[in-house]
Amino acid sequence: MSAADAEYRVRHQSFWFVACVAVLVAQIVTEYLMGRVPICACGYVKLWEGGVNTSGNSQHLSDWYTPSHIIHGFLFYGLGYLILRRKPLAARLLLALVIESGWELLENSPLIIDRYRTATIALDYYGDSILNSAMDTVFMCVGFFFASRAPVALTVAIAIFFEIFTGYVIRDNLTLNVLMLIWPVEAIKVWQGGV
């Protein structure tokens, strides 16, 4: 590779990474304009919120739903690999960020907040803080980069472990969350209420 080719490649990658940062900034600004609270209404920031059905859930840096966002990164890396295989990694990351940021904006809209409150056990869910939502997106990026480097079997094993572990501990995980949002099952709702 010539010096000119290397310089072009760096500049091209830089464009994609700047676009990625712009998506995250747009997500944060949009959530602010939607009236989302910047941080937990409690007035402080925790590294980890271990309560599930508490007012602090989805308000701090990480929580029991963080593994779900890491799995999003695994899945979105796979999607990007399938449809943008010839594009740079940063272009695939941009696709992942657009999907994740779009989900975060939808998840924090009145439509989805009300759906969570009526169809799932999340009766006290009022949406994420901007900080938590941004960190959800960052954790998706962590999963994305992990999947880009790790063997597929390891990535799949970690995703399965996350699903089983969070399902066991909090009776919720990515699979159950999607199922209960799209097609609520009363028996699962009752089981989840036993936490």
From Swiss-Prot:
GO CC terms for this protein? plasma membrane
What keyword terms does UniProt attach to this protein? Cell membrane, Membrane, Transmembrane, Transmembrane helix
Keyword Phosphoprotein on this protein?
A: no
- Looking at the UniProt entry, the stretches that span the membrane are 15-35, 64-84, 127-147, 150-170
Origin, by domain of life? Bacteria
List the InterPro entries hit by this protein, alphabetically. DUF2585
Q: Which family does it belong to?
A: Belongs to the UPF0314 family.
| HAMAP family associated with the record | UPF0314
What name does UniProt use for this protein?
Answer: UPF0314 protein RHECIAT_CH0004233
